[in-house]
């Protein structure tokens, strides 16, 4: 009796014919095309732009002084006192980036805390003073921001970078001339450290104490010497000699 071909043997035999090879090749090509198409589809879907979170959009707008976007976000309920991922509040960030238009929009919002500080204890006025951003400092003062604070102050920061115009403005608004940092460093010491002769003179003329020392026993002249600022050393030495002569001249004559 002849063996009756089974279904599996029939398919196996057919696969070894030229027609069978062509059929299998066509199937494989079809599968490959489908897989390739699927891969491209995955790549395409994976490359679709991800919508930025509102907070990220707000932070970017603050950095680039995009006041329209900031106003839009605020109108939609964004917290003007929110911080970035480094803990920096929006107003402080605006001051750091000199984003004056955004600064105006933020302080115009009644919910904004103009005294808010970052993790380092710095507020917007301090960074505006450090950057020499007079308009930002004026904006904050107009909104009632304090020119004095415990520890480091805006006057320290303005003096550190020799921004005489801001030093003058802060003094006009009753900035404490001999404010002490946590270790007793004064604005005059910061001016001396940076070699800012005109700033040191400005502070001295406003009543800064040239003899005051910080917690490690350094005065302004010591700072100038330590940081190798010869012009400041010369100016402070001359001022000290002048003061000594005045004191000697005002002393009562010995009987």
Model-derived segments and their meaning:
Residues 71-79, 104-113, 138-145, 168-176, ...:
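Ankyrin repeat domain, specifically the short helix-to-loop turn at the C-terminus of the second helix
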Residues 69, 101-102, 135-136, 165-166, ...:
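Conserved ankyrin/ankyrin-like repeat signature
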């Amino acid at each position: 009796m002849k063996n009756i071909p089974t279904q599996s043997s029939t398919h196996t035999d057919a696969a070894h014919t030229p027609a069978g090879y062509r059929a299998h090749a066509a199937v494989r090509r079809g599968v490959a095309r489908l897989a390739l198409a699927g891969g491209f589809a995955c790549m395409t879907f994976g490359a679709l732009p991800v919508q930025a979170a509102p907070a990220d959009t707000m932070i970017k707008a603050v950095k680039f002084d995009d006041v329209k976007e900031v106003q839009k976000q605020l109108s939609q309920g964004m917290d003007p006192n929110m911080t970035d991922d480094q803990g920096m509040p929006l107003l402080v960030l605006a001051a750091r980036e000199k984003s004056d238009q955004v600064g105006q929009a933020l302080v115009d919002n009644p919910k904004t805390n103009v005294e808010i500080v970052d993790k380092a204890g710095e507020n917007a006025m301090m960074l505006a003073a450090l950057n020499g951003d007079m308009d930002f400092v004026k904006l904050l003062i107009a909104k009632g921001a304090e020119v004095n604070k415990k520890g480091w102050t805006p006057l320290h920061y303005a003096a550190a970078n020799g921004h005489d115009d801001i030093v003058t403005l802060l003094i006009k608004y009753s900035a404490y001339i001999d404010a002490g940092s946590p270790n007793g460093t004064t604005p005059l010491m910061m001016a001396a450290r940076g070699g800012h002769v005109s700033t040191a003179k400005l502070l001295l003329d406003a009543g800064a104490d040239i003899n005051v020392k910080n917690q490690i026993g350094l005065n302004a002249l010591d700072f100038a010497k330590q940081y190798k600022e010869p012009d400041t050393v010369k100016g402070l030495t001359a001022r000290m000699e002048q003061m000594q002569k005045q004191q000697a001249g005002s002393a009562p004559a010995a009987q």
